[in-house]
């Protein structure tokens, strides 16, 4: 990913964090990294720990942003989530879910749209 795409991704993650906070989520981690991979946002939603992948695009021209999350990427997120659960010793305390947030930016102005897909995938 080149520099401009990193900026777009980071901007999308900031929008996503604001959005889910307004939905009542509590942010636990941003950009959790380990040797297995990275999870954009880890949050608490009631009795769930939610592992969230954020995809930011300027349009749907190449399909929806969530379509870019391949099975391989899902598996990587799942394994990273497993490590987080073990590290935090929370396996018996919460339910777990994988959400996706799509952020579509507008090139003409500062408007954007956000779509939260709860339980977007299961491994």
Curated annotation (Swiss-Prot):
Q: Which SUPFAM superfamilies match?
A: Restriction endonuclease-like
Q: Which domain of life is it from?
A: Bacteria
Mark the transmembrane ranges: none
- Name the Gene Ontology molecular function terms of this record: nucleic acid binding
Query: What Gene3D superfamilies does the database record attribute to this sequence?
Result: 3.40.1350.10
What Pfam families does its record include? UPF0102 (PF02021)
In terms of InterPro entries, this protein maps to: Restrct_endonuc-II-like (IPR011335), tRNA_endonuc-like_dom_sf (IPR011856), UPF0102_YraN-like (IPR003509)
**Annotated HAMAP family:** UPF0102
Could you say which protein family the record assigns here? Belongs to the UPF0102 family.
Q: What is this protein called?
A: UPF0102 protein CBO2440/CLC_2288
């Amino acid at each position: 990913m080149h520099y401009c795409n990193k900026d777009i991704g980071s901007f999308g993650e900031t929008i996503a964090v604001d959005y889910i906070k307004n939905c009542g989520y509590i942010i636990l981690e941003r950009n959790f990294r380990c040797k297995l991979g990275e999870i954009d946002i880890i949050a608490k939603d009631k009795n769930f720990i939610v592992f969230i992948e954020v995809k930011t695009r300027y349009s749907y021209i190449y399909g929806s942003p969530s379509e870019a999350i391949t099975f391989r990427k899902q598996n990587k997120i799942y394994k990273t989530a497993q490590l987080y659960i073990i590290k935090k010793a929370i396996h018996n305390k919460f339910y777990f879910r994988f959400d996706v947030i799509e952020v579509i930016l507008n090139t003409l102005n500062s408007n954007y749209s956000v779509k939260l897909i709860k339980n977007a995938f299961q491994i």
